Amino acid sequence: MSEAPILKDTTRSTGREALQKNIQAAMALAEAIRSTLGPKGLDKLLIDDEGRTLVTNDGVTVLETAKVEHPVAKMMINTSSTQDRIAKDGTTSTVILAGEMLQNAWQLILQGIHPSTIARGYRKSEQYLLQCISEIKFDSDDKMKSSVVKTSLAGKGHSSMQETIARISLDAVQMVAGIDSTIDISKIKLVSQTGGKVEDSKVFRGL
């Protein structure tokens, strides 16, 4: 007596074919948001099942709104969400960089290099990059810090709000910054009130 198949109307991929399909899924996701990258990035018009629309060029918003079933694509979205939770920026760059790394890894696999060897190479590259960052870092003034904050705010609201948000954000961070410049963002509490303007926002110590 033969056993009934558990998964009907499905196909199974193994080996190099499965690896290629996984990389293709990651690359497709990266390509979907590539045009949103940078200060001149394009907006995406998102429409949900109920017909509601959202215009944004925020990478993590686009990815989390998309209905993706592929497990590797979901991993890429989770990576972007983690980047957003920790750094609050760089979500699009994270996905694009991961996609390019996978694409380059695939080219090396086609040349006969084992995936574990490629993974070791990426880990060594990470160590080298961290060393380079330590060597080229420099102190920044308030003007440069403000510019960095404004850049991260691009596409997240009207440009007229950026000056105010950048100023109060820097003030809040400087209030909680430790002696070694470490910052515990849990010490910053946001309290919002209905009505008024963004320009009315203020920073208070000790609440």
Go through each PLM region and give its residues.
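Hydrophobic or amphipathic alpha-helical targeting/insertion segments
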Residues: 102-143
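Elongated alpha-helical scaffolds
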Residues: 74-77, 89-103
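Glycine/serine-rich anion-binding loops at beta->alpha junctions
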Residues: 13, 83-93
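Extended amphipathic alpha-helical scaffolds
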Residues: 1-55, 60, 126-207
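Short, solvent-exposed positions on alpha-helices
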Residues: 92-93, 116-120, 163
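Glycine-rich oxoanion-binding loops at beta->alpha junctions
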Residues: 50-84
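Short glycine/serine- and small hydrophobic-enriched flexible loop segments
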Residues: 31, 78-82, 100-107
